[in-house]
Amino acid sequence: MIAVRPVTRSDAAEWMRLRRGLWPEEPEDDLDREVAEFFEGTLPEPEAVLLALEGGEAVGVVELAIRPTAEGCRTNRVAYVEAWYVAPGARRSGVGRALIDAAEAWGRSRGCEEIASDTEIANEASARAHRALGFEEAGVVRCFRKQLRSGKDAR
């Protein structure tokens, strides 16, 4: 049976393990700092973190926030899936659905009428999982950045 509940301080190590699975390229120090800041209440988002457990083992996580807007959404208060991860051994067993169902309930309880998410363009497995749970593709976005020069080099 899959249970989904809010993360607690005693879950910090399990949450970190799942975050490292989702973002293996991110420096562990950054991920650790974010978890610490979440429990201190100084991290602006996620606003909520829900952990999925199966047989007492943490097998998935969803990190949530409320955004004033999201691609393709019509309302000005959108529940947003900032992170969604299911451990490889627990995939295709209902864990992802249980997490999104809980995320939807969280959003509704906060007055949201829509829930949104994103994924990397090349992550087809994630896109399929989103579609299977009723998400509709709202657009494809490529993000760009440019370092700003200062002083006499600025133009």
Question: What residue spans do the PLM features occupy?
Answer:
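Conserved acetyl-CoA-binding loop-helix of GNAT-fold acetyltransferases
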Residues: 86, 92-105, 128-132
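Active-site rim helix/loop that mediates acceptor-substrate recognition in acyltransferases
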Residues: 28-49
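Conserved GNAT acetyl-CoA-binding A-motif
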Residues: 107-119
